[in-house]
Amino acid sequence: NVNYNRYNIRSNIDAAVTKSLDVSLDLAGRIEDKNMPNSTSSDIFNVLSTIAPNAMPITYEDGKIAGTSQYRQNPYGMISHTGYRKDRNKVLQVKAQAKQKLDIVTKGLGVRAMVAFDGVSGYGTGKTSNYATYELQRDNTYSVYGEDKQLSLAQEKLYDYYQYQLAFNAGFSYDRIFGKHEVYADARYYQSQLFVQGDNPAYARQGVDGKLTYCFDKRYVGEISFAYDGSDEYAPGHRFGFFPSIAGAWIISNESFFNTKAVNYLKLRASYGEAGNCKTGFDRYAYQSHWSGFDQSSGGYIFGSGFAWSDGAWEGRLPNPDLTWESTRSWNAGIDLNFFNNRVEFILDAYIKKTRNLLLQQDYPGYMGTTGNGAATAQ
C-alpha cells in the first residue's frame, strides 16, 4: 500500500484594465498524499548497505522473516511489518499585483503594489507494528531476535503543523532616455510577517530600498543604491540597518577610438557595497534575558518558618541588548571581455570582503551559573 498522489492547481491571470493599468493574479497550490512504511527510506537503505548479499535469505519457506545474530534487521520486514503512516501536505501560494503608468504626470513614471500569501501545512497519522527475525540452526530450530507485534488498534498522530507568510510591497519606478542620457530610478517600501505554529509573535521584517542608475552614451555607467532594513529580532534602537552601495563602469568598446576587431566588448567596472544579515542562528530575541522555573523535583528552596518548599527560577540566557545587524562590506573591481564575435568570453574579478558586527556565540565559565546564550559582537 505504498503510494504517492499529488494534485496541482495553477492559474496565472494578466489583465490590461486600461491602457495604463495592468493587474495580475497568480495562484499555485498542491496537495500531497503519501502512504508509506513506518521505516524511513534512509533507515532501510542503511540496513541494505550493511548486510552481505549472501548473509541470509529474505524469508524462509514457512514465511518467517530471516535474520542473524549480527544482522537482526531485515529490509523486507522494515518495509512490510513495521506499520504504516499517512501524510497529507498542502501548499498554497497567491500573489496579486498592479502596475499603473503615470505618463500623464511625466513620461516613464510608474507605480506598483504587490501582496502575497505563502502557506504550508501538514498532518501525519500512523499505526505501528513490529517483527521478529529468525535464524535457522542446524537442528532445524530457530533463534529468535526481537518480538512480533500486531498492528496497533489506535491511530497515532505523528505531526500537525502549519506556517504562512504575508508580504506586501509598493513603490515607483522611473525609466527614461534623453538623447544620450539614460536614467532609471526605483524605490519601494516592503514588509513581511512569518507566522509559525508554536512561535509567538510572528517573525517581522520591514524596510525601504531604492536605486538610481545613469548611463551616458552607452559608455559611462553609474549606480547608487541603498537598503534600510529592519527586523524584530533586535531591541528598539538597533532594529534597523542602513546598507548603501555604489558602482561604476566604463564600456571602452563603445568609444570612438576603439577599433580592435578581435575584441567585441570591453568593460572596466568597480563597486563598493554593504549587505546585512540577521539570520544568525541564535534564539529569538537574544537581546532579552530568559528565565526558567523549576519545582521541588529539580530545585527550589525552603523559605519561612513553616519550612514550606518554594519553586525557584534561574537565568537560562544572558542578554545582549546591543545586538544589531551583521554587515559585510565588499570592494570589487573587474574586467569583462568578449572575443571573436562573442564566441569567447573572459571575466576577471578581484574583491575584498570584510564583515563587521560579526555575531558569535559567547561561552561562559561554569561559575557563572548559566550555560548562557549570550551573543558577542566582533569585528
Which residue stretches match the model-derived regions?
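Extracellular/periplasmic, surface-exposed regions of secreted and cell-surface proteins
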Residues: 12-21, 25-31, 35, 40, ...
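Surface-exposed beta-strand-turn/loop segments characteristic
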Residues: 1-3
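Active-site-proximal polar cores
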Residues: 133-134
